[in-house]
Amino acid sequence: MTKSIIVALDEYDQIKFDNVLDQLDPNLCMVKVGSVSFNSLGRESVLKAARKGFDIFLDLKLHDIPNTVKKSVEGLKNLPIKMMTVHTSGGQKMLEESVAAIIDTDIKIFGVTALTSLSNSDTNYIYKRQAEEQVMAMIELATKSNIHGVVCSPQELSLVKNNSNLLTITPGIRLKSLDDDQARVMTPKQAIDNGSDFLVIGRPITCLLYTSPSPRD
């Protein structure tokens, strides 16, 4: 997995999903299939991307009791995916069960720390601590549970890199300041400079597909 850009395919409409996929190059990027596409278009959304040669990040953010997550991962691991997500806050046992379920594959498990849509006021209300404190607690839990990496905002990359050997996936990548639902963001260059292994970029790329001949521009 040498490609560091992951383009988010967050489309529930088959025509729009295909349109985005057709304009991307599997030699330049991976693709993320999340709950929007997977829940509406099913496993075929993953299989179609795989047939076009893409490495796939399945981002379903599984979060349930340990046995349920283990069975869910077992049911998904036969898909042609490279990485998948669970919620780190599901606890050590849940994380360990997810790793055990893919032990005979090359799939990597990433734990979501704190959603990039959450501001400090949100994390204070939900977790009774600042976003960085919540992420640090999840880094420690991820390390203890032997998962492969974490999903964090680019603003917390230094916390991960200075306190663990975990791989990092960073959503919240913006080319400029936008009035949208992301709270903790950075530009691609800032995220790379801070050590991100994989950058998830959705709307900044997919919105260009309707105004530019090619997103590679």
Where is each model-derived feature located?
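Hydrophobic faces of well-ordered beta-strands that scaffold small-molecule active sites
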Residues: 5-8, 31-33, 56-60, 84-86, ...
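Active-site beta-loop-alpha junctions enriched in small/polar residues
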Residues: 8-12, 34-38, 63-65, 89, ...
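Alpha/beta enzyme core
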Residues: 20, 26, 78, 127-149, ...
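Active-site-adjacent beta->alpha loops and helix N-cap segments on the catalytic face
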Residues: 37-49, 65-71, 88-103, 154-166, ...
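Conserved anion-binding
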Residues: 68-72, 81-145
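Glycine-rich phosphate-binding active-site loops on the catalytic face of alpha/beta enzymes
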Residues: 86-90, 194-209
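Active-site-adjacent loop and "lid" segments of alpha/beta metabolic enzymes
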Residues: 111-135, 159-194, 198
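Conserved small/polar residues in nucleotide/adenosyl-binding loops
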Residues: 210-217
